[in-house]
Design a protein with these regions (language model features):
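Peripheral docking tails and interdomain loops at the edges
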Residues: 268-271, 276-280, 388-390, 409-410, ...
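Glycine-/acidic-rich phosphate or pyrophosphate-binding loops and their flanking alpha/beta elements
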Residues: 229-232, 264-265, 283-298, 314-320, ...
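Short, small-residue-biased leader/transition segments that mark boundaries at the very start
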Residues: 1-8
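Non-catalytic terminal/interface segments that mediate subunit docking, oligomerization
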Residues: 33, 247-359, 365-375, 471-473, ...
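Cofactor-binding active-site loop characterized by glycine-rich and histidine/acidic residues
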Residues: 9-131, 301-302, 306-307, 315-316
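Structural signature of the thiamine diphosphate
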Residues: 187-255, 376-381, 400-450, 517, ...
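Long, well-ordered, tryptophan-enriched scaffold segments
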Residues: 143-288
Length: 580
């Protein structure tokens, strides 16, 4: 396994080796544009397109991305990261080809079946099927995304796995008619044009044909010859084509085949057994999930909702204990929020656990379906802040900016496990509207006891300090360390760690106003940040936040580059005071 020493998504890529090879043998990249949905399946594609030597740097600092990046290779036709976007992008590319007079080449969208739970996929299919473009949609069906696929579409696609007899029988009938003298071709064409003579004997038309696609499949995704034949047939059709490919996720590597979900985003592992090199202890996600279980025992109206991230968000514990109150809605964040609003309208308390970067998709629903109606719901914003290896598309740096624009929103940002438990209870018990609890990826690495079960913030004052440092969340630990570094440099600073970060706390404003200078360090996007809001009230506040997209790399390295390590924050404070 190339990359077993790195953190990669082996299952998706082992299942698509033959498919990727067939695509590159049949089509001419980059003239033909290959658009990978999400990009988890694209590692073989990266290797085949000249990045084998660099593959050992995958998802590492200054290495190649774990997703498709047009600025990395001309063979990466479109950026990837979030699910269900490929058909829309490929249709745009195919339309541009048509407008440019290119009637020869194709735009190929490669979609995993996990994306079949996402609404944007169907918006794209609905538009693409009736278009007069050279678009080919390849569905890689393996019955497994990150968690088990859910919903009616998963059942529909599963049922189609068993209906390969349709394509075989149709082919035999057409070959027989070809050999029939005189009337063979006319009869064959009549059968094709009406669709009913053959199909109704064996299989009703697929939904993809009803949308306007020429349907090919199901094809054995591990039979290279069959794949190439199917793709050559798709290439020859002068209309939108849907190719249905069946694969086994983790094909050829027994530990990956046997353990669904466990090889998604897996860390480095022992190649013979598949066992991880490091056994992770509790994380913010698992603590949230376990605490929610305890709360669910007492509150029978508490429900947990995920968008296909049961394991990643720690909700597997709640799902096991309260299956009737656990809901996995698939990769459908927009639907998830409105679904939660419906639960809330009937006096249930929904807790939607979602990664920060995926919550971006739900902005309209947060306002229109939840906030306007005054719904009491809890949003557990996992992976808030820098997440590291997944890069620009997954860094959780925008949630503060858009959540603070929603009226009556409350936002908590705990810095340790105790605060997380406390904030979760507060959010569930506060029935005045939407409460968001945001926390970082990984473990609690606090070195200081900075929790206060009563106050909405923690304030540490030393005599003679005229400078105040402010932060919240994960940065609190390093900022307390920076205070010690500065003390050794004979620089006295006070500190406030916010826990309830929004709405703005008037007590905190009063405290800030008493200092000569306030330096606010924030692991969030600059525009719309909490520091920006305090700076608009207190002219003595200097902001140090993130101003742009953040590439992939290790969290500690990225935080240091952004100026958020203890040493860098201490240097910033010292430099700021010298310039004053």
């Amino acid at each position: 396994l190339v990359g077993s020493e790195m953190c990669i998504r082996d299952r998706s890529n082992l299942g698509t080796v033959e498919l990727t090879m067939a695509i590159h043998r049949v089509f001419e990249s980059p003239k033909d544009k290959i658009v990978w949905d999400v990009g988890h399946q694209a590692y073989t594609h990266k290797i085949l397109t000249g990045r084998l030597k660099e593959f050992k740097t995958l998802r590492q600092e200054n290495g190649i991305s774990g997703f498709c990046r047009p600025d990395e290779s001309v063979h990466d036709a479109f950026i990837s990261g979030h699910s269900s976007t490929s058909v829309s992008a490929a249709l745009g590319i195919a339309t541009a080809m048509k407008l440019s007079g290119d009637k020869t080449h194709h735009a190929i969208a490669v979609v995993g079946d996990g994306a079949s739970t996402g609404g944007e996929l169907y918006e794209g299919l609905n538009n693409a099927g009736k278009s007069d473009t050279n678009i080919i949609v390849i569905l890689n069906y393996n019955e497994m995304s990150i968690s088990k696929n859910v919903g009616g579409m998963a059942k529909y696609l599963s049922s189609m796995r068993t209906k390969e007899s349709y394509q075989r029988t149709k082919g035999r009938v057409e070959r027989m008619l070809d050999k029939t003298p005189v009337i063979g071709k006319p009869v064959k064409n009549a059968v094709r044009n009406s669709k009913n003579a053959v199909k109704n004997m064996i299989l009703h038309s697929t939904m993809f044909e009803d949308l306007g696609f020429h349907y090919i499949g199901p094809i054995d995704g591990h039979n290279l010859e069959e794949l190439e034949q199917g793709l050559m047939a798709a290439k020859a059709v002068n209309k939108p084509v849907f190719v249905h490919v069946n694969t086994i996720k983790g094909k050829g590597y027994a530990p990956a085949e046997a353990n669904p979900g466990e090889f998604h985003g897996v860390g480095s592992f022992e190649i013979k057994t598949g066992n991880p090199d490091v056994v992770l202890s509790d994380s913010f996600s698992s603590i949230m999930g376990k605490e929610l279980c305890e709360m669910g025992e007492k509150n029978k109206r508490l429900c947990a909702v995920t968008a296909a991230m049961k394991y990643g968000t720690g909700l597997q514990y709640f799902a096991k204990r309260f299956p009737e109150r656990f809901f996995d809605v698939g990769i459908a964040e927009e639907h998830a929020v409105t679904f939660c609003a419906g639960l809330a309208s009937m006096n249930y308390v929904p807790v939607f656990a979602v990664y920060s970067s995926f919550l971006q998709r739900s902005y309209d629903q947060l306002i229109h379906d939840m906030a306007i109606g005054g719904c009491h719901a809890v949003i557990c914003v996992d992976r808030a802040g820098i997440v590291g290896d997944d890069g620009e598309t997954h860094q959780g740096i925008f949630d503060v900016s858009f959540l603070t624009s929603v009226p009556n929103m409350k936002i908590y940002s705990p810095s340790n496990y105790d605060e997380l438990r406390l904030c979760l209870h507060k959010a569930v018990e506060d029935d005045s509207g939407i409460c968001a609890v945001r926390y970082p990826r990984g473990r609690d690495q606090s070195l200081y006891d900075t929790s206060d079960p009563v106050s909405t913030y923690v304030y540490r004052h030393i005599e003679g300090a005229k400078v105040l440092l402010v932060t919240y969340g994960r940065l609190a630990n390093d900022l307390f360390t920076a205070i010690e570094i500065l003390r050794n440099r004979d620089i006295k600073c006070d500190i406030i760690k916010l826990v309830n970060i929004f709405p703005i706390d008037n007590e905190v404003v009063d405290i800030m106003s008493a200092y000569d200078a306030v330096l606010f360090f924030e692991e969030a996007y600059y525009c719309g940040s909490i520091s920006e809001k305090y700076a608009s009230i207190c002219p003595n506040v200097a902001q140090f936040a993130i101003d742009g997209f953040v590439k992939h790399g290790k969290c500690d390295v990225l935080l240091d580059e952004l100026g958020f390590s203890a040493e860098k924050m201490a240097d910033t404070v010292e430099g700021f005071l010298k310039d004053e």
